[in-house]
Amino acid sequence: LKCYSSRTETMTCPEGKDKCEKYAV
């Protein structure tokens, strides 16, 4: 899953987590 941080940077959502962590793609 991919999400966007406040800076619109693509971030990865680890499996089992609904919220985006600070994992840069």
Curated annotation (Swiss-Prot):
Record-level Gene Ontology MF annotations: acetylcholine receptor inhibitor activity; ion channel regulator activity; toxin activity
Tissue: Expressed by the venom gland.
TM helices/strands, residue ranges: none
Full protein name: Nicotinic acetylcholine receptor-binding protein Mnn-4
GO terms under cellular component: extracellular region
Record-annotated disulphide pairs: 3-20
Disulfide bond keyword on record: yes
Family, per entry: Belongs to the three-finger toxin family. Short-chain subfamily.
Function, as annotated: Binds and may inhibit nicotinic acetylcholine receptors (nAChR).
Subcellular location: Secreted
Broad class of the protein's primary localization: secreted
Family matches, as InterPro entries: Snake_toxin-like_sf
Alphabetical keyword list: Acetylcholine receptor inhibiting toxin, Disulfide bond, Ion channel impairing toxin, Neurotoxin, Postsynaptic neurotoxin, Secreted, Toxin
